[in-house]
Amino acid sequence: MIVRSLPAALRACARLQPHDPAFTFMDYEQDWDGVAITLTWSQLYRRTLNVARELSRCGSTGDRVVISAPQGLEYVVAFLGALQAGRIAVPLSVPQGGVTDERSDSVLSDSSPVAILTTSSAVDDVVQHVARRPGESPPSIIEVDLLDLDAPNGYTFKEDEYPSTAYLQYTSGSTRTPAGVVMSHQNVRVNFEQLMSGYFADTDGIPPPNSALVSWLPFYHDMGLVIGICAPILGGYPAVLTSPVSFLQRPARWMHLMASDFHAFSAAPNFAFELAARRTTDDDMAGRDLGNILTILSGSERVQAATIKRFADRFARFNLQERVIRPSYGLAEATVYVATSKPGQPPETVDFDTESLSAGHAKPCAGGGATSLISYMLPRSPIVRIVDSDTCIECPDGTVGEIWVHGDNVANGYWQKPDESERTFGGKIVTPSPGTPEGPWLRTGDSGFVTDGKMFIIGRIKDLLIVYGRNHSPDDIEATIQEITRGRCAAISVPGDRSTEKLVAIIELKKRGDSDQDAMARLGAIKREVTSALSSSHGLSVADLVLVAPGSIPITTSGKVRRGACVEQYRQDQFARLDA
């Protein structure tokens, strides 16, 4: 099905399979075991037309419409209705009631929406938030669930009148000012084709019949939006959805949704695999069979090989095949997908000498002093190159550099940020190798390397820790700590004596023990174990281990650690230490 836009794809689905289930939302708030609410393709299409008709009274083609609603079918209908009306959709979470929500403030200020689509359950928080923005023309606030969504509707919008931009995907905001990535209909369509080719490379990009997408990821996040809403429509596949809260309350629900008669395609960040393996009991899985799972991609944050192994081992007795777990790399600026692991086999890890890697050279090794990295297929589309970020010259095999991406899935830039757009999306390679375009290239800000035709990812360049003159990936240090603590942690460097940087680790723990004395003894034992592990695995001496309660470490909306904020909180002594 070749289409130019998401509304055109939805219209085709409604015409070709009107009575087939399109989106099913499992509501665990009504019932602990879940209540299934389903829309067919024709119902979904009719509802988006009614939202579009309502939006036709607000602004004109190309104006922005924010979707700020709880996770549910109303969010799906609102997002698609905004596109159907020729408006630029802006996916957003519901603002936090009664408190300052800097991210929502930034997005509303930057996008200047003519309308906000919400629901009756969330409208008070939305109104309260908008009211705190005096001096600006207020957007219309529309409660989608109060519209007559199933009314007959003759609303039409010509295909050639749609703006090229589909939506603004605001970055998860490791800084306080998230930028809106300008996503076109072409970006989304091309990236869908690329990800299908990557995940189903052995079947010409075509999944088997009776496949369905399963997702609990938030719709305002790039992976949640593409996997949960865009991919089902572009492929004509049914989707089974629930909310992040439902997953966090009981991770077994994710496993239940994938243990179905259909072939499930799902996605989650690394922490979700850890959580599901740790908190799902055998009783939870009684009578469940995971043998029909097609793919579970792990992305959005650094993929830890040890976590994947624990997840695969935990659910092997319920017929989960390790080969269906696909570590993946991508970013919002490239729509969502760039690369994945090789199909048909368990994820491959390779050990590299830590000392050499710190110096920028990938040297495979065996035994101690190694950093384990997951291998990814070097994709044909999009094109990926490893580039020296200072000289803009391609790096030879085995040399660490910045990952650059080129393809029609790459956005044109950030909304109303020309200078930042040029820096990020306007990369040009000096003296490119044969078959390599000069530009423009997306400079991802991620470090990695290619060797033996495989790509390896190290982490964010700006997060690189420099301790005593050596480069260290915080992801590697955090992975070592998490093998001991199993919780969230943050590795940061802060100024020390004599112009050196020192390593500090912030570690979330539950304070357990029959008495305060027992609890303190346990915390002391964990400190000693972490200190020893960092010394033996990384040759690092940790200057300070800060043990804090769960929820203390600042994170982005997608669950990534805000390391810059951690540094500021540490320097201002704002962390409440459990062992104080």
From Swiss-Prot:
A GO term from the CC aspect: plasma membrane
Pathways involved: Lipid metabolism; fatty acid biosynthesis
Sequence intervals crossing the membrane: none
Keywords: ATP-binding, Fatty acid metabolism, Ligase, Lipid metabolism, Nucleotide-binding
Any GO BP: Actinobacterium-type cell wall biogenesis
Signal peptide: none
Highest taxon in the source lineage: Bacteria
Keyword S-adenosyl-L-methionine set for record: no
Disordered: annotated span: 421-440
Identification of the protein by name: Long-chain-fatty-acid--AMP ligase FadD28
